[in-house]
From Swiss-Prot:
Posttranslational mods: Contains keratan sulfate.
One Pfam family hit: LRR_8
Alphabetically ordered keywords of this record: Disulfide bond, Extracellular matrix, Glycoprotein, Growth factor, Leucine-rich repeat, Proteoglycan, Repeat, Secreted, Signal
LRR repeat boundaries on the chain: 112-131, 132-155, 156-179, 180-199, 200-225, 226-246, 247-277
Glycosylation sites per record: 88, 214, 258
Cysteines joined through disulfide linkages: 255-288
Subcellular location(s) per record: Secreted, Extracellular space, Extracellular matrix
Any one GO cellular component localisation term in the record: extracellular matrix
Tissue: Highly expressed in cardiac right ventricle, cardiac left ventricle, uterus and lung (at protein level). Detected at low levels in skeletal muscle, uterus, small intestine and liver (at protein level). Detected in blood vessels of kidney, pancreas, spleen and brain (at protein level). Detected in aorta and skeletal muscle.
Molecular-function annotations in GO: growth factor activity
Protein name in the entry: Mimecan
Gene3D superfamilies: Ribonuclease Inhibitor
Amino acid sequence: MKTLRSTLLLLLFVPLIKPAPPAPQESPLTFDYAADHLEEAIFSQDYEDKYLDGKNIEEKQTMVRSVKRSLELQKDESVTPAPPKKENDEMPTCLLCVCLSGSVYCEEVDIDAVPPLPKESAYLYARFNKIKKLTAKDFADMPNLRRLDFTGNLIEDIEDGTFSKLALLEELSLAENQLLKLPVLPPKLTLFNAKYNKIKSRGIKANTFKKLNNLSFLYLDHNALESVPPNLPESLRVIHLQFNNITSITDDTFCKANDTRYIRDRIEEIRLEGNPIALGKHPNSFICLKRLPIGTYF
């Protein structure tokens, strides 16, 4: 009975009981990293822009000052007169030739005369052109020449004294031209080449080679010589006389007939092939030589 009464009272008061409102909870503290980073980036960019703007302005100002200074210098230079040129500074224009470090190359350019060249020239190569004559004026102002090469031209005449002022000339090539005679040669020649011309024995004077004490190489092959040139210097090492019209050789041509002990030891090569002569008929002509000439002996 008591239990039933308690149950009824509980049912009567339950509707009157209201649940208490939930206690307000504080929201947890959050950190918006993106927003904060964005603000920092904006600040940094703004600062950097201002810094760079200032730097660019400074650079532009510096550049303007440099340009002004350059213009002032140019103005001063234009007012200042240039020093007069010296005569030694002026050099002839090589025109069709190529001038390089004392060497002048005028090969296969169809010139018919020796062009004006720098005074300092030491080597002139004028091969395979149309030059017909050489004169003393061609080399009057070129005292330093050491080598001249006129191979393959049309040279018929060489004026007297053409090479007289070329005291330093060591090598001279007149090969493959139309020469009938030889000019007076400079004293210091070591090489002379006049092969493939039309030179006859009467076109070579008796003393042409006598005083050339430095001459080592002599090329006179493929000409019209009837005899070996006289008075060949002791300095000769190579003598080319092949394919001429040489018909006779004497005991004095290369040796000394009156001196059987004489030996010509410097000569290394003598070529006489292609001549109408039997070398075997002249045994005493080569007795002073270490090597017999190249040619037909029988």
